[in-house]
């Protein structure tokens, strides 16, 4: 409905090279990843990439993921609320930008190679592997 109302331009990114996919994500204001729990529990590399680019990212986070990662920057959507959540964002450019910035900071904190390496090193050290 939103596309036919000319409120959004929908770009399905699939069956293209990684470099083309990255370029198209970079041009997005909003990125929608997994809805319907078909690709996993909550988010995947597509979402990490879009967040790292500062793109507002929507995905379906189940209750387990929400409790495990309560500080995530995703806008949690499902098939029932996707349209209404998109309408909220479309009418609030500042929220889109704020979510994008929050996502970028979150990826730097949770997925940056140095931070992950430090966490793993400390864990391995604590269990006697190092």
Residue ranges of model-derived segments:
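Conserved catalytic-core segment of nucleotide-activated headgroup transferases in glycan assembly
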Residues: 1-18
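Flexible glycine/serine/alanine-rich "lid" or loop that lines and gates the nucleotide-sugar donor pocket
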Residues: 26, 52, 69
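Hydrophobic acceptor-binding patch used for acceptor engagement in glycosyltransferases
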Residues: 29-34, 56
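Short hydrophobic beta-strand element within catalytic cores of glycosyltransferases
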Residues: 52, 56-59
